[in-house]
Amino acid sequence: MSMIIFDIETNALKIDDITKIHCCALSNGGDTVLYTDPDEWLPILENAEVIVGHNIIQYDLVAIKHLYPKFNPKGKVIDTLIVARMLRSNILDIDFKKKWRDMPMQMYGRHSLEAYGYRLHLNKKHADLQDFSVLSKELEERCKCDVDVTVKLWNRLQPEANAIPYAVDLEMRFATLISKQERSGFAFDVKGALELEAMIAEKLNTLDERLRQRFPFIDGGIFTPKRDNQSRGYIASC
């Protein structure tokens, strides 16, 4: 089974602002190769039996589809961010127990690639890079490093993920649908909702009337408390 682990670097963080994918780093578990020509890396991703990446359902695959609408990967998609959240839901406890030597406290409990870079002793290169407008050596190194971290992370997670394939597949499909809803919204039947509201209101009125008949108001006369009773809210002579 051909498996490709990948990462891309774009010129913007928001999908709608992306106008260019600078580079794509690919690995089949061995050396990581960097591509800048989409005609080279797009077919590899499309034809792979399995594609793996970190946060690719929410970002990378969406970004590629944004610029290349005909992009249609045929293989299975595995997002290590989702798998990590599934299998390491107690990551904050793990971090405090391990007390990673070089890991900043603000990284504790996070599932970002930068955080996993510290945990796997493969620190993310140029994590503080701010300029994504043009392709640079730093951006290329960052892209390749992200893939190297993802490869190492997936090697750790894969044995556990393989033991629960249905759960992993379900999470991937669910994340894909949620991602689509976040971008496109979802249909809402306004007419049907109003009809349902009217039907519920009518039933509530019917139930209210039945309750009034079943439990009628009882006139107990006038009651004047002789002394204060804080628990019942009584005030003497009132």
Regions found by a protein language model. Give the residues of each.
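A general structural motif
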Residues: 1, 47-49
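Active-site-proximal helix-loop-helix substrate-binding element of RNase H-like nuclease domains
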Residues: 14, 19, 26, 30-36, ...
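Short amphipathic alpha-helix with an adjacent loop that forms part of the alpha/beta core around
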Residues: 39-45
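Generic structural signal of hydrophobic/aromatic residues within well-ordered alpha-helices
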Residues: 41, 83, 113-117, 207, ...
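Conserved "right-hand" nucleotidyltransferase catalytic core of DNA-directed polymerases
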Residues: 1-9, 21, 103-108, 124, ...
